[in-house]
Amino acid sequence: MAVRAGALILAAALAAASAVAPFSSMAPGAALPEGWRALHIARIAPSEISLAADEGVTVLRVHSHASAGSAAFALDRPVAGTLAWRWKIDRVVAKAELDEKHGDDFAARVYVFFDIPDDAFPWTERLRLKIGRLLYGAELPSAAICYVWDNSHPVGTSAWNPYSRRVRTVVVESGAAQAARWVDEKRDLAADFRAAFGEAFAGRSRITGIAAGNDTDQTGEEATAWFGDLRIETPR
């Protein structure tokens, strides 16, 4: 999903939570769990977002065909803890290119949204954010990390999104070798935040939401992603 303003909007009507509602608590075919909302980008065909059964467990399914979409959940918590999830894809997006606008497509994405002080960004990005919030509302997050399943770049590759230097893309899976298999992930949110936006802002920032989805609107390809429950684990 290319980060064009609408992709980052979290539902203003949703009360921010401290824990993420699980997909596995719902029946296949039911509406998304309370707190989750489907997000689509204006003027781009919407991906199919649904709850489906996989190996006896209800998971999130996102199917895209020259389209884009995700499910988002609003949060309000400090930049700390470990984000854990599992995901599966049917194929990679063959023509994707993570640092080019024409190739900004991924078989699966997981976003973490942040509220970061304005002085973390150059004036050009501050101006874009101000305009975006005037157009789309104050709920537009100021920054995000986007964990992706890429087609070819090595795991660990990190780059600014080609549409915004407020969004850092991090490759956590790459290639088709693990396609059609569930893969477990864990990310240290504080460490990833510091790597993307700097140590100085971690204590003054908040996590404002997460999202899971995929997109093929740039390349015109087709891909399906499945996501198990997403959770933020904190040390006891």
Regions found by a protein language model. Give the residues of each.
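Bacterial N-terminal signal peptides
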Residues: 6-16
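Solvent-exposed strand-to-loop "edge" motifs in beta-rich extracellular domains
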Residues: 86-92, 115-117, 190
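Short carbohydrate-recognition loop motifs
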Residues: 48-69
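Extracellular beta-strand ligand-recognition surfaces/modules
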Residues: 108-110, 164-175, 179-220, 224
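Extracellular/luminal beta-rich ligand-recognition
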Residues: 105, 109, 115-163
